[in-house]
A protein has these predicted regions:
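Extracellular loop and loop/strand-boundary signature of outer-membrane beta-barrel proteins
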Residues: 46-49, 94-101, 143-149, 179-183
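Residues that define the transmembrane beta-barrel architecture of outer-membrane proteins
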Residues: 32-34, 53-59, 103-109, 124, ...
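Hydrophobic alpha-helical segments of small multi-pass membrane proteins
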Residues: 111, 128-134, 153-163, 176-178
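Short glycine/proline- and aromatic-enriched beta-strand/turn motifs that initiate or cap beta-hairpins
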Residues: 22-67, 191, 198
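Predominantly the C-terminal beta-signal and adjacent terminal strand-loop region
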Residues: 83-89, 162-199
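Transmembrane beta-strand segments that form the barrel wall of outer-membrane beta-barrel proteins
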Residues: 36-46, 134-135, 172-182
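Gram-negative (and chloroplast) outer-membrane scaffold detector with strong preference
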Residues: 24, 60-143, 191-193, 197-199
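Cleavable N-terminal export/targeting peptides
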Residues: 1-32
């Protein structure tokens, strides 16, 4: 999984740099109050979550709305995350269990506020982002042909930042956020690193 994630980051970064180099400045057309887009990237588990979960990936869509004379942009997101299980962790906790074929998956529905900094007319613009939402978490595994699963639906928070690149007719962005989900016993924490687009 780390090798796959490394190849993905290098490839996505190269595409982002190439697209930025071809930018011809912002369009003179009137700006719409809304945008749609998508993002994908790596999901890094933290804390107790990282004990049993490998590095993972995520894929999602977004909708943004900018009210006139309001400094923030409102963003709604639907994202799917998937992380593999660490066999060595579960083998240590349950001796004799052998190899487990399973994963952690998560859907999150999030409402965010995005606060940009600097001049919007520039080719690139940093921003802060944060919000709250509903997270549907599920752990699934196959043990000797028997399917085992457990799921929770909990609220969570996220906070982070990124950089938007204004290209000809659309935008790309790089973003890093910290998520904490208020799951039973202990919070589930993770950091997604995302490469995305909006138009």
């Amino acid at each position: 999984m780390p090798r796959f994630l490394g190849r993905f980051v290098v490839g996505a970064g190269a595409l982002l740099i190439a697209a930025t180099a071809q930018a011809q400045g912002p369009s003179n057309a009137p700006a719409r109050p809304w945008k749609i887009g998508g993002a994908l990237g790596g999901t890094i588990p933290l804390g107790n979550f990282s004990d049993g979960a490998d590095l993972g990936w995520h894929l999602g869509g977004l909708f943004e709305y900018k009210q006139p004379s309001v400094p923030v942009t409102w963003r709604g997101e639907l994202t799917y995350h998937r992380n593999g299980l660490k066999d060595d962790y579960f083998s240590g906790q349950l001796p004799g269990i052998g190899n487990l074929d399973g994963n952690f998956s998560m859907f999150n529905f999030i409402a965010n506020a995005v606060l940009p900094f600097g001049d919007a007319a520039k080719t690139w613009q940093p921003y802060a982002i944060g919000g709250l939402g509903l997270y549907r978490l599920k752990a699934s595994a196959d043990f000797n042909g028997i399917d085992i699963s457990d799921s929770q639906t909990k609220f969570g928070l996220n906070l982070g930042g990124g950089v938007t690149f204004n290209l000809s007719g659309f935008e790309t962005f790089v973003e890093l956020r910290y998520h904490t989900v208020f799951t039973k016993d202990s919070n589930t924490n993770f950091i997604p690193i995302s490469f995305g687009f909006k138009f």
